[in-house]
Amino acid sequence: MLRIAEEVTTALEEGRAVVALESTLISHGLPYPHNLAVAEGLEAEVRAAGAVPATIGLIEGVPVIGLNGNELERLAVGGDRVRKLSRRDIGAAIVDHADGATTVAATMALAAAAGIEVFATGGIGGVHRGATHSWDVSADLTELGRTPVLVVCAGAKAILDLPATLEYLETQGVPVVGYQTVEFPAFYTPHSGLTVAAVAADALAAARMWRIQRRYHTFAAPGGMLLCVPPPERHALEREAVEAAIGRALARAEAEGVRGPAVTPFLLAAMAEETSGESIETNIALLRNNTRVAAEVAVRISELG
């Protein structure tokens, strides 16, 4: 059922480093042609660090591990025709022969099915603010608890309830590791006031943590690991400014009655307006940084064997 690119298959068979990349950024994150340029740039970051990129998505109902250039462009220009797929949506998309962009949860599931251990993304989903009333909790969190993939990110998206998200990850038994930081990043800013469970000083330390977790998965964490990389300092936003912008964005969402899956894209778009586009620049910068770190960690994992 999976179609795995020949380059990816060869790398996996030879024990070389492969990094999975999601595709929702392409179809739902940025306008064309910026989305395509960023996607191609992320793949270039992986290659520059010595690993093989595997951007994941569905093309005409077929899960593809390693989209080619034409397929990347197909998702980039597809607009509303391209479905946003979490794990629960994959089956229906296959039946309907639909094109689909994969979220963190879906990308993790497909990466694991293909034998890929490392995945780079911007920020994971989490517990939404007001979840005590809405019960809006991202499937990314439960996926991390059950699927053995090391996810490299800049924490959870800042629009979320970060303390509750960390509590949920603890409940799921997911190690939250800071990359050269003791503080859980808040996506746009390195500062959240929240601490991580462990710290990796470099890519080799992160790789060793992951190898030990997988070796002893019967009594250590059986699922994924979150490696949290602060956004690059020169692109990071001030914590106070971020919180103020989020407050205004949340008020707009409430006033307009935005609910369900529409909440996150609405809030991210509102954040871009509230910050005069700075949040988009930060998002792209942290994506590139996370991807580079993920590739370096993947190379170290392959060297450990």
Curated annotation (Swiss-Prot):
The active site is at E22, K157. Pfam families: Indigoidine_A. Its cofactor is Mn(2+). It is an enzyme of class 4 (lyase). Its EC number is 4.2.1.70. Binds 1 Mn(2+) ion per subunit. Substrate binds at K84, V104, S138, A139, D140. The keyword DNA-binding does not apply. Keywords: Glycosidase, Hydrolase, Lyase, Manganese, Metal-binding. GO terms for molecular function: hydrolase activity, acting on glycosyl bonds; metal ion binding; pseudouridylate synthase activity. Mn(2+) binds at D136. One of its GO terms (biological process) is nucleobase catabolic process. It catalyses: D-ribose 5-phosphate + uracil = psi-UMP + H2O. GO terms for cellular component: cytoplasm. Coiled coil: none annotated. Belongs to the pseudouridine-5'-phosphate glycosidase family. Homotrimer. Catalyzes the reversible cleavage of pseudouridine 5'-phosphate (PsiMP) to ribose 5-phosphate and uracil. Functions biologically in the cleavage direction, as part of a pseudouridine degradation pathway. This is Pseudouridine-5'-phosphate glycosidase. The gene is psuG.
